[in-house]
C-alpha cells in the first residue's frame, strides 16, 4: 500500500514578524551562476541535505510551504537555535492548534548557497512521523524561502536540482517544452491549468492550483471552490494524511483528464477535500487545489520565481 504523506497548508495563526524582511539566500561565490544539489526521491518527495547552524540535517523541499519547519530533533541534536519564543500554529485537519517554538537569526546553508538570518518554526512533537513512514531520518521541511530568489531546474530522473542566479539566467526555450506563467502569493507558487471533470462531460474547467512538491499525491481539488468541482459518482473515502491539526480525510477518485498547456494527462487520480478541511489553506481565495509530485515527477521542471515562469518538459516518467 502506498504510504500517504501530506505536508501541506501549514497556516500560522501567529505571525510575529515578516519573514521576508531579511536578506535571504544568496550564492557565497558570486562569480558562479549555478549550484547543483543531489536529492533523494522518496515516495515522490525530494529530500535534500542542508546545514542549520553548521549541523547537517535532511529536509524535504516543499514548494507548498513558505516557512522552514523543524520537527524531528532529539537530545543529541545540538543545533544551537537562537532567539526562541513560543507561538501557536494551525494546519489542515479539524483538531486544535499546536504549540511550537519560533527561532530567529539562524544560518542555513546548502553547498554554495547560504542565509544567515533565517526564521525556523520548531514543532515540539513530530505529528507527521515522516522518518518512520519514509524509512529515513527527516528533520524538517524547507519551503520557498530557499527558492524565491533563484531560478531552479528540477530533474526527477537524475535527481538533481540546479540553482541559478535568476538575474543572470534566462531559461532557453525548447520546442518540446511548455512555458506557463505562475503567480506567487505569500511566497507560494500558483498555476492555472485545465481539468476535465465527470460532472461536466467533455468540458475543461480552469483551476488555480498550488504547485506543491511537498505533496506525494497527483492532484487535490477543493469541493465547491467552483460550482462544478464535486466528487464523481465513483469514489472511496480515504485518509489522505496527517496535518498539524489532525487526520486529513478526502474522497479519492479519477477525472478524465488534466491539461498543462500542451501536455494532457489522462485519468489522473484526484483527492477531493471538503470546505471545512481546507479553510486554513485558502490564503488565495481563488485557489481550487494543489498539483502534487505524482504529476511533477513526470517532467523536468524549471521554476523561475523572480520572473514568475514555469517551464515543463516531459521525461521518461510521463505516460
Regions found by a protein language model. Give the residues of each.
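Pepsin/retropepsin-fold aspartyl endopeptidases
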Residues: 19-319
